[in-house]
Regions:
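A short beta-strand motif characteristic of beta-propeller blades
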Residues: 2-4, 53-60, 101-106
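Acidic carboxylate motifs that coordinate Ca2+ or other divalent cations, activating on Asp/Glu
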Residues: 21
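Short, surface-exposed beta-edge/turn micro-motifs
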Residues: 24-25, 40-41, 76-78, 90
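Acidic, small-residue rich beta-repeat scaffolds with periodic aromatic anchors
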Residues: 1, 85-155
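Beta-propeller blade termini
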Residues: 9-18, 62-80, 111-123
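Hydrophobic beta-strand segments that make up the repeating blades of beta-propeller
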Residues: 26-30, 78-84, 123
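Extracytoplasmic low-complexity, Pro/Thr/Ser/Ala/Gly-rich segments
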Residues: 1-11
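Beta-propeller domains
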Residues: 33-51
Length: 155
């Protein structure tokens, strides 16, 4: 962490055994230099041997919205990061590892939260009504063990 902070502010870091090899790796959220908010520069993956790879760096004017989230599901480890560009919602980016290499899941960037409850993974959907304002409804996600990807339930 100290070496990374030399280059950019470290806003969040989750160290876990993401690839299941018994050693810890990390997903790290780095900020933009001299930012008064928590403007995100990128999300990086730190391998157990110290090598660092860019998981996603094409952010444009977004801030870290909340703490990052580590989720274990069906023997896999997932890293979720919520970002916001202002307004009433946020976007969640979702990452994991496959065959020892990090990857971004297909639903990444289209989710709004990612969490596990009662052995099911969920996202939320923003429902607005004039009477109650913004409400966030839990939406269960389907998981395909073969592709190691989540999908929305069929409508």
């Amino acid at each position: 962490k100290t070496a990374l902070e030399f280059y950019r502010p470290v806003y969040a870091m989750d160290c876990e055994d993401y690839d299941g090899d018994g050693e810890k790796e990390a997903f790290v959220v780095l900020g933009k230099k001299n930012s008064s908010s928590k403007a995100i520069q990128g999300i990086y993956y730190v391998y157990s041997d110290g090598w660092i790879g860019p998981a996603r760096t094409n952010f444009s004017s977004v801030d870290l919205f909340s703490n990052t989230n580590y989720v274990e599901y069906d023997g896999k480890s997932f890293f979720a990061c919520d970002v916001s560009g202002g307004g009433s919602g946020w976007v969640t980016y979702l990452f994991s590892t496959q065959n020892g290499i990090y990857y971004e899941l297909n639903l990444s960037g289209s989710l709004q939260s990612f969490f596990k409850k009662d052995d099911t993974c969920y996202t939320t959907k923003n429902v607005f009504s004039a009477q109650y304002g913004h409400q966030y409804v839990d939406v269960p996600l389907n998981y395909d063990k073969d592709t190691q990807e989540f999908s929305y339930p069929e409508s």
